[in-house]
């Protein structure tokens, strides 16, 4: 029984409310269009207040329900203009208390995601004398906080102007000091330097941080140039030994001062409209922070050690390439006899090793002719040119280290002469650095220019030479490399050192390469002769024993020479086990067995063509041409007669399966056709549903 529907009376203050009952009744098309137009007309004044809003001030559309903080607008009624902020707060609180009796208060503070926010949309237009018929920009402006998704772009012009001023200042400077403070101090100083700051109420952006860092670098430029003018080139070793404390370094390296300059020049040379390379500045800042951290904790290992070594490697390579051109004059002032000799590595150790005394190898001064080295070069010196009694202290060189220091108790005479010549030039150029004694070991390695490039790569030794060379023969193999007469030292030492330098540039293991041709003709002929005599030192018993073993391991080719008909006759006399072994070991025999269908002498497979396709009753396998599998040739003394068809042979009864003489799981198709004609009709009826017993 359905109730009769009646029209619901509506007030004039609620023109937008349409009950569910009215929706069920038939409505004309024009009335529906007018309702949509009316709804659109009431939603428009929420965006732009107009005269229609003043006329229908009592009507409250849906759009005015969201704000929590009220603000003044131009389209208010005179009653609303007379109210101040306190009156608004009183009305707001009164609305909250008034909602206890009827519907929930519309102007209560609605949190995001609260259910009251949905209810407030339907309960709003019942309170006609409520304030706030205007749209407020943000509904979350409580306690005077700034809007979440709005950015103040007014101060961006000030930042750009200040950034251009910093670029103009940096274009005039030539060097910059490493940054003393990190990013965490950047915002504090930047806010305190200027009175109000660029943006005093919010954190600084990356562009402002970069501008601040450039300003700091310019301010500290004068002190850096004073300290760096008189200091010589000191190459700082990135990875230091753990047990040895490093010596203090009073002067900063000029390579580190020149490196930011080389990176800032392309920045300042650009047009002022382009943005700053923030990645370059941040990478430079991180490298400097890590450098200062390494100076505070010199010997400690931290998680940033690998990153610190990589940053130091980049700084050293760039700085050494820049300082290489300015230091060519000091390198050319050496002895003219050393022009073909190129120094490969100049090592510097900040402390003296325990194996050596300070007085033997300590000189006051540093080298001015430090060549530019790639960061991935690792040098391994060959110790064959030294005496057996010499002690060698080596510092291991990894890929991240820039240089490797080698110290020797006694060097060859020609190398000592060159070291003394270079030390004279070194001490003349740097008299200021005599304050800190440094232990320097200079390894002079020479490379001959006209040497073929094929000898530079490491040659593979002959096979078997590792067992024939002993330690005594190794010392006799290079007698000419160590002993040279005094008058020939100036001439013959250069090709000799060329051979040593080529071996020093290569990475070598503990075993020494026996056939490394030297530059001198006398040494090369002696090495070739000694390498030829190494093969004659093997005993005759060893050669005879090895020949006998090789003869035993060689396959015998007698069977392969026989014709096929003879091989087939031989195979038919073999048992199944022997034939299966021959088939598995040789492909030639396998092809013969399968092609000629050779059966073993003790095979139990039925040769009758009627049962050729009949499978085994238990393993369900059919006979294949040349099949010698072990599961089909055992004798089956017992016959299992089935009532519905032919029986089959089996190796044992089910009760005898546990006996050791039983051949478990080995069956063939040699079955007995007992009562075959008698049980044919029964066999046809039960063929589809028969289940055979498996023993």
From Swiss-Prot:
<feature type="region of interest" description="Disordered">
    <location>
        <begin position="239"/>
        <end position="275"/>
    </location>
</feature>
<keyword id="KW-0833">Ubl conjugation pathway</keyword>
<comment type="subunit">
    <text>Directly interacts with SKP1 and CUL1.</text>
</comment>
<feature type="domain" description="F-box">
    <location>
        <begin position="556"/>
        <end position="608"/>
    </location>
</feature>
<feature type="region of interest" description="Disordered">
    <location>
        <begin position="472"/>
        <end position="524"/>
    </location>
</feature>
<dbReference type="InterPro" id="IPR036047">
    <property type="entry name" value="F-box-like_dom_sf"/>
</dbReference>
<protein>
    <recommendedName>
        <fullName>F-box only protein 34</fullName>
    </recommendedName>
</protein>
<dbReference type="InterPro" id="IPR001810">
    <property type="entry name" value="F-box_dom"/>
</dbReference>
<dbReference type="Pfam" id="PF00646">
    <property type="entry name" value="F-box"/>
</dbReference>
<dbReference type="InterPro" id="IPR039594">
    <property type="entry name" value="FBXO34/46"/>
</dbReference>
<feature type="region of interest" description="Disordered">
    <location>
        <begin position="316"/>
        <end position="373"/>
    </location>
</feature>
<comment type="function">
    <text>Substrate-recognition component of the SCF (SKP1-CUL1-F-box protein)-type E3 ubiquitin ligase complex.</text>
</comment>
């Amino acid at each position: 029984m359905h109730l009769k529907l009646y029209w619901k009376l509506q007030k004039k203050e609620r023109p937008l409310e349409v009950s569910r009952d009215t929706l069920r009744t038939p409505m004309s098309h024009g009335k529906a269009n007018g309702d949509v137009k009316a709804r659109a007309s009431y939603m428009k004044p929420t965006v732009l207040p107009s005269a229609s809003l003043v006329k229908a001030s009592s009507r409250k559309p849906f759009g005015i329900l969201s704000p929590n903080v009220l603000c003044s607008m131009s389209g208010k009624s005179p009653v609303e203009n007379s109210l101040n902020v306190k009156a608004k707060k009183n009305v707001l609180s009164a609305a909250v208390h008034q909602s206890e009796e009827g519907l929930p208060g519309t102007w209560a503070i609605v949190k995001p995601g609260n259910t009251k926010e949905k209810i407030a949309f339907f309960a709003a237009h019942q309170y006609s004398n409520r304030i706030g018929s205007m749209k407020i920009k943000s509904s979350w402006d409580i306690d005077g906080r700034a809007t979440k998704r709005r950015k103040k772009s007014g101060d961006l012009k000030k930042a750009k102007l200040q950034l251009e001023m910093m670029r103009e200042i940096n274009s005039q400077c030539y060097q910059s000091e490493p940054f003393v403070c990190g990013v965490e101090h950047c915002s504090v100083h930047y806010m305190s330097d200027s009175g109000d700051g660029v943006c005093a109420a919010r954190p600084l952006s990356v562009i402002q941080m970069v501008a601040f860092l450039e300003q700091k670098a310019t301010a500290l430029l004068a002190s850096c140039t004073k300290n760096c003018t008189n200091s010589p080139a000191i190459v700082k070793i990135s990875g230091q030994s753990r047990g040895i404390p490093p010596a203090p370094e009073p002067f900063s390296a000029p390579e580190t001062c020149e490196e930011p300059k080389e990176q800032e020049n392309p920045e300042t040379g650009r047009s002022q409209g382009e943005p700053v390379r923030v990645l370059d500045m941040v990478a430079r800042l991180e490298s400097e922070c890590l450098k200062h951290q390494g100076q505070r904790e010199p010997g400690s290992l931290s998680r940033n050690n690998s990153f610190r070594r990589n940053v130091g490697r980049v700084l050293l390579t760039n700085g050494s390439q820049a300082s290489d051109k300015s230091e060519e004059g000091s390198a050319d002032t050496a002895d003219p006899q050393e022009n073909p000799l190129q120094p490969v590595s100049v090592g510097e150790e900040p402390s003296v090793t325990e194996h050596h005394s300070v007085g033997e190898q300590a000189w006051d001064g540093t080298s001015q002719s430090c060549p530019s080295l790639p960061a991935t070069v690792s040098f391994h010196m060959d110790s064959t040119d030294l005496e057996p009694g010499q002690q060698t202290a080596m510092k291991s060189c990894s890929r991240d280290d820039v240089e490797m220091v080698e110290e020797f108790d006694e060097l060859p005479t020609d190398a000592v002469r060159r070291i003394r010549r270079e030390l004279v030039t070194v001490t003349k150029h740097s008299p200021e650095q005599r304050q800190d004694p440094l232990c320097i070991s200079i390894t002079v390695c020479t490379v001959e220019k006209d040497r073929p490039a094929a000898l530079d790569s490491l040659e593979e030794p002959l096979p078997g030479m590792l067992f024939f060379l002993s330690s005594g023969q190794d010392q006799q193999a290079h007698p000419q490399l160590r002993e040279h007469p005094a008058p020939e030292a100036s001439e013959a030492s250069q090709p000799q050192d060329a051979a040593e330098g080529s071996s020093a540039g290569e990475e070598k293991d503990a075993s020494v390469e026996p056939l490394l041709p030297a530059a001198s003709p006398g040494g090369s002929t002696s090495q070739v002769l000694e390498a030829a005599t190494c093969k004659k030192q093997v005993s005759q018993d060893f050669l005879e024993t090895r020949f006998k073993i090789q003869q035993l391991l060689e396959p015998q080719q007698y069977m392969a020479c026989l014709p096929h008909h003879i091989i087939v006759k031989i195979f038919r006399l073999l048992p199944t086990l022997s034939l299966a072994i021959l088939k598995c070991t040789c492909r030639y025999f396998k092809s013969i067995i399968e092609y000629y269908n050779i059966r073993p002498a003790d095979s139990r497979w039925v040769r009758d063509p009627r049962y050729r396709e009949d499978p085994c009753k238990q393993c369900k396998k059919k006979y294949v041409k040349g099949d010698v599998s072990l599961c089909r040739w055992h004798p089956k003394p017992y016959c299992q007669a089935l009532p519905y068809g032919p029986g089959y042979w089996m190796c044992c009864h089910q009760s005898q399966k546990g006996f050791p003489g039983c051949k478990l799981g080995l069956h063939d198709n040699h079955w007995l056709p007992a009562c075959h004609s008698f049980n044919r009709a029964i066999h046809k009826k039960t063929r589809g549903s028969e289940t055979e017993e498996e023993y």
